[in-house]
Amino acid sequence: MDFLNYPEPLADLITGLSRLPGIGPKTAGRLAFYLLQQPQVAENLAEAMIRAQREIRQCSLCCNYTDHDPCPICTGEKRERTLLCIVEQPRDVVSLEKTREFKGLYHVLHGVISPLEGVGPEQLTISKLLGRLEGVQEVVMAMNPTVEGEATALYLSRLLKPLGIKVTRIAHGLPVGGDLEYADEITIARALEGRRQI
């Protein structure tokens, strides 16, 4: 999209919005004009973004996003501490928590192993994971059913099995190439119930 005819601040806003995932130049333009017509919405959005950047951080235990460290899940007294679920992203924790089926703790990798994108085990939170396994009896791999998700689950299972930890994978009630974030609660709950040892 050609922004040459727009004032520089508007062109910068459109460019910035178009860098967000799933937002192309046309949608970014529509959003920019909406925000110009709704100054209170724009101001509230800007304040919320600044506040989130300032206050949200990774939990020092599970690496999920939180405004309290450690996060409420890690400090929850009713959580099953012998059960740990490994997920790719913080939004996957939200999807699993919506089902109310999983009672254990989580560990967020913040990605998957993807050599083509230059992401190896060192770029993920695997070292923190290995440092928090004391007392854990079962690890549930809840990576998305993609080639990278499967490769990451296999890599982690090879690290964890020699430690005597039972390693399971959620059942594939999820479509290949799909994300936990977009699955409904029933599908995720069935996938958790049907997890299998790997």
Curated annotation (Swiss-Prot):
Domain Toprim: 82-175
Gene Ontology molecular function, alphabetical: DNA binding; zinc ion binding
GO aspect biological process, one term: DNA recombination
Pfam families: RecR_C (PF21175), RecR_HhH (PF21176), RecR_ZnF (PF02132), Toprim_4 (PF13662)
UniProt keywords, alphabetically: DNA damage, DNA recombination, DNA repair, Metal-binding, Zinc, Zinc-finger
Zinc fingers (C4-type), renumbered ranges: 59-74
Domain of life where this protein originates: Bacteria
InterPro entries hit by this protein: DNA_Rcmb_RecR (IPR000093), Rcmb_RecR (IPR023627), Rcmb_RecR_Znf (IPR015967), TOPRIM_dom (IPR006171), TOPRIM_RecR (IPR034137)
NCBIfam families with a match to the protein in the record: recR (TIGR00615)
Function: May play a role in DNA repair. It seems to be involved in an RecBC-independent recombinational process of DNA repair. It may act with RecF and RecO.
Family: Belongs to the RecR family.
Name of this chain's protein: Recombination protein RecR
Organism the protein comes from: Desulfitobacterium hafniense (strain DSM 10664 / DCB-2)
